[in-house]
Regions:
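Short helix-initiation/N-cap motifs at beta->coil->alpha
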Residues: 38-39, 57-72, 173-185
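Pocket-flanking alpha-helical
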Residues: 45, 65-100, 181, 185, ...
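Ligand-binding cleft/hinge of the Venus flytrap
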Residues: 48-55, 138-172, 282
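Ligand-binding pocket segment of bilobal, Venus flytrap-like solute-binding proteins
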Residues: 78-82, 153-219
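A conserved helix-loop-strand patch within extracytoplasmic ligand-binding domains
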Residues: 101-150
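A bilobed periplasmic-binding-protein/Venus flytrap-type ligand-binding module shared by bacterial periplasmic
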Residues: 114-125, 228-242
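C-terminal functional modules
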Residues: 253-305
């Protein structure tokens, strides 16, 4: 993702090297975490909360849209967010980084992600395989493209395609909904074998529970490389300096698409995210060791040497 690394110099200036041997300020004990209502971010944020709480921190989670979370970090009402999907959110995030309002981690917490428009496989087999094909199926689709929550960067990019009449989509309507609401609509369409175009992404159990295909030929409308994505951690601009121990944990907190998908299946089956996180840590002690290497308990000895 070349345009992500274009801003690496800016991010590096904001995320200075940590020194976990120094005692953190008392204010660092409270960790204010923003969580978007996306299952992947719920899973990773739950893992971070469980680990931080075990290290003696007091972690508070605020569930809100990505815009509210980013504004909360800018306004010093929140400390961090594990759900910056790049390039989908780059237009929102980069200006805030350049203005010194937020900071982005030096490395992503997830690679090999993907996010773009998708269709059920039966519709793909009927010939709706590319972005350019969508307009040909307008009547069957009811002139609708199904996105996620209102105000999301994803929806803004889909709406931009419509506003510019890109791919002949000028007369289409974007249907905004929550992740759960959108997927419920997809399942209803699947049961009727009805036509539907929706926003899909990896990691997510939808890739297993739904017979679906991603569209190609996006012409970078939702980012280069047909929706290839990475996920990054966002913090307060001075967080690495003020709370280097937490920052070290965040720098080391990286996930795989397979691991996230496994946790997401359990969450979507009705389990509480924190319970899923605890079970994951119990079954994967090597992850805990990797994430907490060189990280100290708050006000105490190192958790791992």
């Amino acid at each position: 993702m070349s345009h992500v690394y274009r801003y690496a110099g800016v991010c590096a200036l904001l995320m200075v090297a940590t020194c976990v041997s120094a005692a953190e300020a008392p204010s660092c004990k409270q960790v204010r975490m923003g969580v978007a209502n996306w299952t992947d971010v719920m899973a990773t944020s739950a893992v971070a909360k469980v680990v931080l709480d075990e290290l003696g921190y007091a972690t508070e989670q605020t569930f809100a849209s990505e815009q509210i979370v980013l504004t909360g970090i800018k306004d010093n009402k929140l400390d961090l967010f594990l759900g910056y999907w790049s390039p989908l959110m780059t237009a929102s995030v980069v200006p805030m980084v350049e203005a010194g309002q937020i900071a982005v981690s030096r490395t992503p917490n997830l690679t090999q992600a993907n996010a773009t428009l998708a269709v059920p496989r039966y519709l793909f087999d009927q010939g709706l395989k590319t972005f350019a094909d969508i307009a040909r199926f307008k009547d069957a689709l009811g002139g609708k493209i199904h996105g996620i929550e209102s105000g999301s960067a994803t929806n803004q990019q889909i709406q931009a395609m419509i506003d510019k009449n890109q791919f002949g989509l000028g007369s289409f309507k974007l249907v905004e909904s929550s992740e759960a609401g959108m997927l419920a609509e997809v399942r209803r369409a699947e049961n009727r074998k009805a036509a539907i175009v929706f926003f899909g992404w990896t990691p997510h159990p939808m890739n297993v529970t739904l017979a679906m295909n991603y569209l190609t030929g996006s012409q970078d409308a939702l980012g280069p490389d047909e929706g290839a994505a990475t996920v990054w951690t966002v913090t307060r601009p001075d967080y690495a300096q003020r709370c280097p121990n937490v920052q070290k944990l965040l720098d080391q907190l990286t996930f795989t698409t397979a691991g996230e998908s496994q946790m997401m299946v359990a969450i979507l089956a009705g389990q509480k995210p924190e319970a899923v996180a605890r079970q994951w840590l119990k079954e994967h002690p090597e992850d805990r060791q990797r994430w907490t290497a060189g990280v100290s308990r708050f006000g105490a000895e190192r958790a791992q040497q």
